[in-house]
């Protein structure tokens, strides 16, 4: 009989349990150690009870497990059943189960002991960690206290460092007073020209700035007053040095200029190179001196510098400029003089402005005053030429050139030049405009208001190939375009315009945009009004000695030309005429003379009234043109229809003979009017009026009951045709 134990493979339970149990301490956490211990104890008690109960059970015969039983497969009680033949399996005795149970109990006991050891070690570790945590928190608290202490120490260190720096800076502010006082009270020779002088000035400014910002110091007011006194002494030391250097430089330049031709002096760097080098040394010192000076100190300090500098520069430049300006003046041409003089003065101004900024602090008012004194001869020569100039074209050219010169400076890109520099030419522009207006007024009185018409003016010879004078085509609205002043007059003469109209438009074209817009409007209104009155006078003159129709065509033509050309100008035609109304005064005087009771009324009404009337020159021009056109049309219609007498059929023949000469009327109109659409308007108006007159005549003939068509046919007179036939004949002849 085989031993039953030999059929069980040796299984190392300790190894399996050890392998399964080693991981328990890793899984269990410190906070759940007591729970794990209680659970293991309960399991151990339950296993003991199960073993005790199994020993009392009756022994069962051994049976081979069913291989298909799922429970056996799950429990894996016989892992070797697949390899062994079932016939070799013999039923196991009951005592082997007890041995296995005891063995299991021993293993569980061993496991329990191991768990107890692990739990004990875990408790020790937990207590160790808790103590370490407390020590760490204590260390962290001490560390934060230490960090806060370090920060306080760092703050105190920075504060003490600032105090130390302030003390050190205060020592540098208060300590130099004695040394600076000694230097400025007893300065060495040429002290202002040395580098140390500028360094001392910089140190003074630093001390003054610090004390002004820290007036709460105990002795700040005292030291501040002492330093400002030293700054005033520094100014007194620098002033004679500046004057001496400027005068020495001026004398050297004058000495060198005598060796050079006067024509080349301004074109060389003689007047600017040495002064620029001097300014390179003087300007920084002047800037430091003026940095913290009060306004009162500057007003007492800088004017002496400006006066000396401008006197020396005037001494250098004025003789040379006067020489060149005099040579320009000898040409006796105002346009040439202005152009050459401004070109020279522009270059000189830019150089002087640049040099002044390099030496002194820029003062626009003082510099412009100096510049006006330097240009005094230019203004005197210009006034002389302007007062003697009578040519309107020359004056307009000069005025236009000066305005272009000013605009070029205002629109220039030079930032170092003040745009107000153009103001020094404003007095010259005003004088030019005043002279321009005087010449224009003289031209209006002489050439327009006093013009006497001649027979040649009624029938001028016009060039058919000439173009219509159009101010817009001549680009008068473009400032950059310069026109030939003779072009408008030549074109006007080629078109056969009345000389008064020619001169009026030429004057307007010359002064357009050269004077104030309000002044131009006044001149334009006066010109238009004078031109209209002159044309009406010329019409009356031509009507006395010539055909009135030709005189009307002359008037219409020039009115149309004047109206068309005025559209090229921006003119406000409406103006206000002011006057005094004395009518009630004279009425009261007459009533007072006739009735003594009118004395009281005279007292109330002897004050004249100030009245204003609005005058529209364009409306006046349109009204005169309308009168002339209507007069011409009415006269032409009367010429064709005056032969029609009521009740006389023979007058129709005379009427037909007259309208046969209608092409002569077209030719007459074409002599004065060149535009086809205007001619057709005239002819259409005349044609319609003639037809209307003839219709009225025809209706009067038909309404006359004494006249019949049969009676006239019997008497051999002309028979009366239908009205439409007559109208068609009139249109066919007058078309």
Swiss-Prot record:
Chief location of this protein within or outside the cell: Golgi
The keyword Protease is annotated on this UniProt entry: no
Biological process annotations from GO: Golgi organization; intra-Golgi vesicle-mediated transport; intracellular protein transport
Subcellular location field: Golgi apparatus membrane
GO CC field: cell division site; cis-Golgi network; cytoplasm; Golgi membrane; Golgi transport complex
Top-rank taxon, per record: Eukaryota
Keywords in alphabetical order: Golgi apparatus, Membrane, Protein transport, Transport
Topology class, membrane: Peripheral membrane protein
Residues spanning the signal sequence: none
Pfam families per record: COG3_C, COG3_N
Assembly and oligomerization: Component of the conserved oligomeric Golgi (COG or Sec34/Sec35) complex which consists of eight different proteins cog1-cog8.
Stated family: Belongs to the COG3 family.
Function: Acts as a component of the peripheral membrane COG complex that is involved in intra-Golgi protein trafficking. COG is located at the cis- Golgi, and regulates tethering of retrograde intra-Golgi vesicles and possibly a number of other membrane trafficking events.
Name of the protein in question: Conserved oligomeric Golgi complex subunit 3
Species this protein is from: Schizosaccharomyces pombe (strain 972 / ATCC 24843)
Name of the encoding gene: cog3
């Amino acid at each position: 009989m085989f031993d039953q134990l030999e059929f069980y493979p040796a299984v190392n339970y300790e190894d399996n349990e050890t392998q399964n149990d080693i991981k328990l301490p890793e899984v269990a956490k410190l906070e759940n150690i007591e729970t794990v211990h209680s659970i293991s104890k309960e399991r151990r008690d339950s296993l003991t009870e199960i073993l005790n109960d199994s020993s009392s059970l009756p022994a069962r015969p051994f049976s081979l497990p069913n291989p298909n039983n799922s429970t056996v497969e799950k429990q894996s009680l016989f892992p070797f059943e697949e390899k062994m033949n079932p016939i070799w399996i013999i039923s196991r005795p009951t005592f082997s189960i007890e041995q296995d149970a005891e063995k299991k109990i021993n293993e569980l006991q061993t496991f329990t002991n191991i768990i107890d050891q692990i739990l004990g070690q875990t408790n020790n570790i937990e207590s160790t960690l808790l103590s370490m945590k407390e020590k760490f928190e204590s260390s962290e608290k001490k560390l934060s206290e230490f960090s806060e202490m370090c920060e306080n120490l760092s703050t105190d260190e920075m504060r003490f460092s600032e105090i130390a720096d302030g003390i050190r800076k205060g020592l540098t502010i208060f300590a130099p007073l004695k040394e600076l006082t000694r230097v400025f009270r007893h300065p060495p020779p040429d002290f202002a020209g040395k580098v140390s002088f500028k360094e001392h000035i910089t140190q003074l400014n630093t001390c003054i700035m610090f004390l002004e910002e820290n007036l709460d110091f105990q002795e700040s007011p005292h030291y501040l007053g002492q330093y400002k006194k030293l700054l005033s002494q520094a100014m007194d030391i620098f002033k004679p040095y500046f004057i001496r250097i400027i005068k020495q430089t001026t004398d050297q330049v004058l000495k060198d200029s005598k060796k050079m031709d006067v024509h080349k002096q301004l074109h060389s760097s003689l007047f600017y190179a040495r002064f620029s080098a001097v300014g390179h040394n003087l300007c920084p010192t002047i800037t430091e001196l003026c940095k913290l000076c009060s306004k009162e100190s500057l007003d007492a300090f800088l004017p002496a510098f400006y006066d000396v500098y401008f006197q020396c520069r005037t001494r250098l430049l004025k003789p040379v400029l006067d020489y060149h300006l005099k040579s320009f003046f000898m040409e006796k041409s105002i346009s040439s003089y202005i152009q050459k003089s401004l070109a020279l003065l522009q270059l000189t101004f830019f150089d002087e402005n640049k040099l002044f900024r390099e030496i002194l602090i820029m003062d626009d008012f003082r510099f412009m005053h100096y510049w006006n004194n330097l240009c005094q001869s230019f203004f005197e020569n210009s006034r002389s030429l302007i007062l003697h100039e009578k040519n309107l074209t020359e004056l307009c050219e000069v005025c236009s050139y000066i305005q272009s010169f000013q605009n070029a400076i205002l629109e220039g890109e030079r930032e170092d030049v003040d745009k107000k520099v153009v103001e020094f030419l404003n007095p010259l522009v005003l004088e030019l405009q005043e002279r321009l207006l005087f010449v224009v007024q003289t031209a209006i009185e002489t050439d327009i208001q006093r013009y006497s018409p001649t027979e040649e003016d009624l029938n001028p010879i016009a060039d058919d190939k000439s173009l219509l004078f159009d101010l817009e085509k001549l680009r008068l609205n473009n400032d950059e375009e310069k026109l030939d002043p003779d072009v408008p007059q030549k074109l006007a003469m080629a078109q056969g315009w009345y000389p008064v109209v020619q001169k009026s438009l030429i004057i307007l074209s010359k002064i357009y945009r050269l004077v104030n817009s309000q002044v131009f409007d006044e001149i334009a209104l006066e010109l238009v009004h004078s031109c209209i009155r002159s044309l009406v006078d010329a019409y009356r003159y031509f009507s006395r000695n010539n055909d009135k129709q030709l005189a009307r065509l002359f008037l219409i033509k020039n009115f149309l030309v004047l109206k068309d050309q005025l559209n090229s100008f921006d003119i406000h035609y409406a103006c206000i005429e002011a006057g005094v109304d004395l009518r009630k005064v004279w009425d009261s005087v007459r009533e007072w003379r006739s009735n003594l009771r009118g004395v009281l009324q005279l007292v109330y009404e002897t004050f004249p009234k100030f009245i204003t009337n609005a005058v529209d020159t364009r409306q006046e021009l349109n009204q005169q043109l309308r009168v002339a056109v209507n007069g011409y049309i009415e006269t032409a219609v009367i010429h064709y229809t005056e032969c029609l007498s009521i009740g006389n059929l023979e007058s129709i023949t005379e009427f037909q003979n007259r309208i046969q000469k209608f092409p002569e009327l077209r030719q007459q109109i074409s002599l004065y009017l060149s535009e086809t659409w205007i001619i057709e308007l005239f002819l259409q108006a005349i044609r319609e009026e003639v037809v209307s007159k003839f219709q009225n005549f025809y209706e009067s003939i038909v309404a006359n009951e004494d006249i019949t068509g049969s009676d006239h046919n019997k008497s051999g007179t002309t028979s009366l045709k239908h009205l439409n036939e007559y109208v068609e004949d009139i249109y066919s002849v007058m078309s």
